[in-house]
Amino acid sequence: AFLRMVDSYRMNGLRVSCDCYPYYAFSTAIGSTTYDEGWLERYHCGYDVVELCEGRYKGRRCTREIFEEVRRDWPECLTVCYVMQESDVDMALRHPGVMLGSDGIMNGGQGHPRAAGSFPRLLAQFVRTGKLSLYEAVRMMTAMPADKLGLSNKGSLQVGADADVVIFDPDRVRDHATFDQPTSPGEGIDYVFIGGELAARDCRVVRGDLGRSVRKL
């Protein structure tokens, strides 16, 4: 229903787009509005779909008692919630108006593997399996978000653009981040250049001081 709404807006000339990541669970703080009254009914689930990412209950699925205790005493605690449907995520990632996003949240190295794994995972599990073409995947990771944010010097290889380049092996690239080890680097990404400077080699950071944050658009 949501994607049909996006299609309707786009057909009427509105620049509507959205992003998605290639995982079937989301992550947020246990105190977020996502878990406000009615969430169990909305997701048609029980408390055991929620896994705690940190603290004394790290790695455990919730009971009602644990959920209420942590939400009351530590609302910032990160969780992973296993309620997303594979068919819905796959449909979204094949939609022409959807960009790839990591939506990365990390707290002391704990959190969701999407922060480290989204981009190599898309190439491994969607391109190599034929769900997306390599062109489509690269576009939704580069040109689409750059265009959406108005970053005219980003997202493409052309004269005058910033020399931000990722060199990867499409046959080897894959993610290794898991819900137990969410920061594990992938493989098959040989080089990353930011502004023409080497930032990473073989999925390992060489320089972490390159680039700059986008404060205002």
Language model feature labels by segment:
Residues 8-12, 125-128, 143, 147, ...:
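Short, well-ordered loop/turn and helix-capping segments at boundaries between secondary-structure elements
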Residues 99-100, 117-121, 125, 139, ...:
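Feature representing long, continuous alpha-helical segments
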Residues 80-83, 89, 134-138, 146-183:
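Acidic, glycine-enriched loop/beta-strand segments at the rims
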Residues 1-130:
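Active-site neighborhoods of metal-dependent hydrolases
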Residues 20-28, 141-142, 161-165:
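A glycine-rich phosphate-binding loop feature that marks nucleotide/adenosyl-phosphate handling sites
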Residues 1, 24-28, 106-110, 145-148, ...:
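Flexible loop/turn segments at secondary-structure boundaries
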Residues 214-217:
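Short, solvent-exposed cationic patches
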Residues 90-97, 102-103, 165-212:
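C-terminal cap of metal-dependent C-N hydrolases
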